[in-house]
Amino acid sequence: MNFEKLIVKHVQELVPYQSARRIGGHGHNFLNANESPKSEGYFLNSTTFNRYPDCQPEELIERFADYAGVHKSQVIATRGSDEVIGLIVRAFCEQGKEGILIAPPTYGMYEVAANTNNALVATVDRHEDFTLDANQIIDAVKSSKFPVKVVFIDSPANPLGIVFKKEELEKVLNALEDTLIVLDEAYIEFAQKEHDLTYLVKDYENLVVTRTLSKAFALAGIRCGFAIANENIIKALLKVIDPYPICDPVAQIAIQALSDHAVGMTLERAKCCNERREKLRADLNELPFVEKIFESHGNFLLVKFKDGPKVFNRMAQKGVILRSFETKKGLKNCVRISIGSDVELEELIRYLKELDI
């Protein structure tokens, strides 16, 4: 039997998202996935594990809504914010006819979600310094050869680390009232408070903000994310989500993580991470083969080396796993370094100082 003939044509051509775990690497010091270097302790009540969970656990939705400063009707919980991205494309883009707009280099899951759902992909060029303004996005949407239903903007951006300004976002929202604007705030806890634009959801019906517990909350392993939007968008997403997206252990842990005390610890952890990030920046600036260190509002630094592949490969040989962006648009010789623990970062700098480049 020729199984290829059974597979849908666009699925045959898919390239899976190359996550840090999928790329792999043998090492002991993993600075490639923007994870927290430390896991917190939580408790589980196993007496309900024999029952199917609620699709949207009420206490979890209420806790996150309180944390984000929105009404619970404006929130949907998902298996990480990656699932939200896929749900948005599935619910709002007609297969083969409509699509999304992205601004490379950006988070790879936007394009993967579009390809998986047979949606089209348009791109907009960034400025030479990788910044992005409203006029670029508006012009790209209006000049697209197909209807752009969704625009994805990550802020802080991954892997660039920069933020999208409030005035630029509002200009886009006002000019593209019939387009869904998705603001990915996966790293927002590491940024200054003024960069959190979630509150704009109350003023703009076409704005969706995505969040995750994977980064600052140090819960990448449980896969829990959220979308914040007007009630009609949330209802549409609930139509295409699986029946039981949030399993009971995940809900229990996430609810604990969103308590006032735990949130306070998370924000303090993010502050300490930022301090380590700037210490790492200072240490890297002393190395003669570092050409540029990008601005960062996340738990990572994007670094341009004189020879990025050599740095990446030599660190891997030492068991320090970084993330290369060598093949991404405009990022030749660039390597992203996650902000690990003091010990992990000290080891990285020690090995980098041994390099002859």
Q: What are the functions of these language-model segments?
A:
Residues M1-E59, R63-D66, P147:
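N-terminal "arm"/small-domain region of PLP-dependent enzymes with the aminotransferase-like
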Residues V11, E58, A91-I153:
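PLP-dependent aminotransferase-like
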Residues P57-G99, N117:
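Phosphate-binding glycine-rich loop
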Residues N206-E286, K292-I293:
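PLP-dependent aminotransferase class I/II
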Residues N274, E286-K318:
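Conserved PLP-binding catalytic core of the aspartate aminotransferase-like
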